[in-house]
Amino acid sequence: MNNLKIMGNPLPDMPWEERPAASREIMWRCSANPIIPRDLLATSNSIFNSAVVPFKKGKYNYAGVFRCDDTNIRMRLHVGFSADGLKWDILEEDIRLEGADPEVGTWVYGYDPRVVKIEDKYYVTWCNGYHGDPTIGVAWTDDFQTFHQLENAFLPYNRNGVLFP
């Protein structure tokens, strides 16, 4: 357990909390949870933060794609930015996906987003409602403003896909 090695670029300003004393867990939660309040947005019932990456934009050092359920529990994806990885500015509007064939791009629901940087693009995967069934949606962005939707991956009936660089 003492031989952990993190592969990737250093992130010296990433928030970190040491493992609690006497804990043997591989992963542990921040003692300040929840980091993002469930009702941060005017219409949100709950917000889930599973897709954050380092991203420099003005005062911000991090960008993320968040599942934000509204008060009718409609699952939507929203973009957020943070200077410190703890205090987040999440945009009120949900992500608008561009470029997909209308049959693929019709929004039903989306949840459990993941983001990975591959070369000069950030790829987002999420559980995408496609004709009422779950599949893996895929889109890319280079600025966290415009998202280009690609074909759904692994039809039918898949969810929680992730790309590894």
Kindly label every feature range from the protein language model:
Residues M1-V108, V116-P165:
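Beta-rich carbohydrate-recognition and catalytic domains
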